[in-house]
Amino acid sequence: MKNSVGISIATIVAIIAAIYYVPWYEHFERKSPGAGEMRDRIESMFLESWRDYSKHGWGYDVYGPIEHTSHNMPRGNQPLGWIIVDSVDTLMLMYNSSTLYKSEFEAEIQRSEHWINDVLDFDIDAEVNVFETTIRMLGGLLSAYHLSDVLEVGNKTVYLNKAIDLGDRLALAFLSTQTGIPYSSINLHSGQAVKNHADGGASSTAEFTTLQMEFKYLAYLTGNRTYWELVERVYEPLYKNNDLLNTYDGLVPIYTFPDTGKFGASTIRFGSRGDSFYEYLLKQYLLTHETLYYDLYRKSMEGMKKHLLAQSKPSSLWYIGEREQGLHGQLSPKMDHLVCFMGGLLASGSTEGLSIHEARRRPFFSLSLERKSDWDLAKGITDTCYQMYKQSSSGLAPEIVVFNDGNIKQDGWWRSSVGDFFVKPLDRHNLQRPETVESIMFMYHLSHDHKYREWGAEIATSFFENTCVDCNDPKLRRFTSLSDCITLPTKKSNNMESFWLAETLKYLYILFLDEFDLTKVVFNTEAHPFPVLDEEILKSQSLTTGWSL
C-alpha cells in the first residue's frame, strides 16, 4: 500500500523507526537537554531494562542482564516479587506523565498486577529478611495501592489485599522477643523468627528501625492498630537501655541485641546498618505529624554535626565520617555511597517539603538556626556526592570512598582527579545506586536551582554510557551493574539490582518533572511514595505515639 506521493507504508515505518531508535545514544551527548527530553530518555532507559527482564527473567527475583540468568531468592524457588513489586509504582509514575510510551506503561502495569494477583503467593516455607521484604515488597505494594488510587490506573484492591497478607506474616517477627525488637529473618509460612546467623545474633540497628513507615501506613489503611503498636515498641528499649540521647548524643552503633535492646557493636556510621535509622525518625514525623520523632531526629543531627562531620582536602568537601571505635575513637574519613541520601534528608527536614523560598517566610524555619544549618549542610553533602561522580574517571561513583583528610596512607588506592578522595581496590564497584540522584532530586524541587538538573543529566548520561549492554541496538539494549567503575573501559557485572528500576530511575525521572509537591508525599527508604496521613483520621483511629522518654 502507498500514499498519494508514492512512498510505501513500509518506507514510512522504516523512517519512523530510524528516528525513534538511532538518536537515543547521540542525544546523550547533547548538553543541557530540556526536562521533557530528559523524561523521554529516562523512560526509554527504564523500558529497555524492563523489556529485557520481561523477556528473559519475568517473575524471578534476581536477574543478570548480560547472560540473561535468573533465580528466586527463597529456598524452594518460590518468587517474592522482588523486581516486579519493587518496580510497579515506577511504571505508574511514568505512565502518568509519559507522552511517548503511555500505552506500553499501562499494559505493563496490567501485566504486573495480574502476576501479583494470580501468581505471587507469600505463603513461602523459607526465611526472608524482615527489613528488605518490608521496604521493598510491603512498601512497593502500599505505594502501588496509593498510586493506583490517585492516578486511577489498575485495581488498587489487588495491592492492598496482598499487602495485608504480607504484613500479617511479617508482623509475627515482632513477637519473637520481650523487647519487641524483631530477629533479622522470619519464615513466611510458619511465622518462626530467626536470629541473625552472624554477629552473635545481633540485629542491624537500621533494619529494625526502618519498618515503621510501612506498618503505620498499613494501620492507617486498615484501621488495625496492632501494626502501629508493634513497630513502635522497638524504640523504648533502644533509647532507654542505652541512654541513647545522653551517652551517644542520638547516634547509634550499627548492631543491637534483640533480646536485651543493648548495643552489640561500637561502630557508628551513617552508611550500611546505620543509615535509615536516622531517615525514619524524620520521615515518621513527616508522614504522621508525631513531633517526638522530629525531636529525636533533631538530637541525632546535632550529634552527627558534632562527632562525624569533616571536610576534605583540597576542596573542603563536607563528608560524614565513621567512628569505628565509638564516639571517643578516631574519626575515619571513609564514607559509603549510601550516605549520599543525607543531602535530601537534611533538606526535606529543614523545609518540611516546602521550597526554601517559602520556608524562609515561615517561623518554623526563620527562627531556627538548626534548620538553616541543615539546609546549608544539605547543599554541601549533595555537592560532595556529586563530586564523587564528577571526579571519577567514568563519571560514576564507586561504592565506598575514603576522603583525603591529610593523614591517609593510600598505598595502591586510586586517587580522584582533584584529590579529594581515594578508592580502595575492593570498593570500585557501582551497583547503580540511587542515593545521590535522590538528594539531587530533593535539592532541585526544594530550591529550583537548575544546576541540580544539570548534575542529574550528567549522571544519567554516565549510567547510559557505562552500564549499557548492546548499547548500539535499542532492541537489545539493557543496563547492568559494574564490578569496576574506575578503570576505563568500565567492567560490567551480571546483575541488575531491583533498585535500579525502583529508585534510581524513579528519582531521576521525578527530578525532571515540572511539578512535584514534596509536602504531600513521603518516600520510604526504597523510594516508594506514601501520602502524608490525615491528622483527623489518625486521631479518629487512635493512631498516636505510644511511648515517651
UniProtKB/Swiss-Prot annotation:
This is Endoplasmic reticulum mannosyl-oligosaccharide 1,2-alpha-mannosidase. Keywords: Calcium, Disulfide bond, Endoplasmic reticulum, Glycoprotein, Glycosidase, Hydrolase, Membrane, Metal-binding, Signal-anchor, Transmembrane, Transmembrane helix. One of its GO terms (molecular function) is mannosyl-oligosaccharide 1,2-alpha-mannosidase activity. The gene is MNS1. Glycans are attached at N96, N155, N224. The chain crosses the membrane at residues 5-24. Its main location: endoplasmic reticulum. It is a single-pass type II membrane protein. It is an enzyme of class 3 (hydrolase). It is found in: Endoplasmic reticulum membrane. Coiled coil: none annotated. Pathway: Protein modification; protein glycosylation. Its cofactor is Ca(2+). GO terms for cellular component: endoplasmic reticulum; endoplasmic reticulum membrane; membrane. Ca(2+) binds at T525. The active site is at E399 (proton donor). Present with 8260 molecules/cell in log phase SD medium. It comes from Saccharomyces cerevisiae (strain ATCC 204508 / S288c). It holds the Pfam family Glyco_hydro_47. Residues 25-354 are lumenal.
